[in-house]
Regions:
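An N-terminal amphipathic alpha-helical segment
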Residues: 1-35
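A generic signature of intrinsically disordered, low-complexity regions enriched in glycine/proline
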Residues: 12-14, 28, 50-52, 61-64
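A short, charged, amphipathic alpha-helix used as a generic interaction element across diverse proteins
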Residues: 33-53
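C-terminal edge-of-domain segments
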Residues: 57-80
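Hydrophobic beta-strand residues in large extracellular and virion-surface proteins
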Residues: 26-28, 38, 42, 63, ...
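Intrinsically disordered, low-complexity peptide-like regions
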Residues: 22, 44, 55-58
C-alpha cells in the first residue's frame, strides 16, 4: 500500500516504522536532514533484526529507503 505522509507536529519517524507491514511504501516529503534520519532508523532496525536472527546475512534487509524512486519524496519500503 502506497501512503503519502504529511509532516506536521505529530510526525515521528519511529512511529512510521512501527506501523509498517509487509509491502507498505510510505512517501515522506524530501528534506536532506529528515532523509538521513530515516536512513539511520532503517539501518538500526535492519541491524537489530540481524542480531535477533530474523534476517540472515548482511545483504538481507527488511527496510529500504529511496530518494530516487518517487522524486520529491523519501520512500520507506518494507520488504518483509
Amino acid at each position: 500500500m502506497v501512503r503519502e505522509i504529511t509532516v506536521d507536529e505529530n510526525y515521528q519517524t519511529v512511529r512510521l516504522f512501527n506501523e509498517m507491514k509487509k509491502g507498505d511504501i510510505y512517501k515522506v516529503p524530501y528534506d536532506k536532514k529528515r532523509h538521513n534520519g530515516i536512513k539511520l532508523e532503517a539501518s538500526r532496525r535492519n541491524r537489530d533484526l540481524r542480531l535477533i536472527g530474523t534476517l540472515k546475512n548482511k545483504m538481507d534487509v527488511k527496510y529500504r529507503v529511496s530518494a530516487t524512486e518517487y522524486p520529491g519524496f523519501s520512500a520507506i519500503i518494507c520488504l518483509k
